[in-house]
Amino acid sequence: MRQFLLLGVFFCSLVLLACTSAKSETKELQMVPLENAEVERVYGLYQQGDYAAYVAEMASCDNAPESYRKQMADLHKQHAMLQQEKMGGVASASVVKLTPSADGRQTNVILRVNYRNQTHEEILLSFVWVKDRWRLR
């Protein structure tokens, strides 16, 4: 009886180990590298004036109250208005460089923003892999 019990515990442990290792491999396979098109889509929300949607892309705001998210959207709107006054607004934006972290779960993006007054700047956006998709940090 005791041998049967030990054999049962061993078998259950083996099955549990197999299930947990298979699950982590599945998650690894699902993560895709960040692509330029996704960065441009997210920055396009800002560029088009959809500040609430831009803030919704921020993983850091997921658990924030709605009032905080509204403040963040208002801050981005104010920043865009300043860009409009000083530089005529954003004409275009393009990805210069994607730098993934060692584990691939975070990517720093250098984005070149061209303004209507013929000036430009390079900005850094940080993206993180959260819940099976890329989000602004």
Predicted regions, residues:
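Short solvent-exposed beta->alpha transition segments
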Residues: 36-40, 52-102
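Short, compositionally biased low-complexity segments
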Residues: 6, 46-51
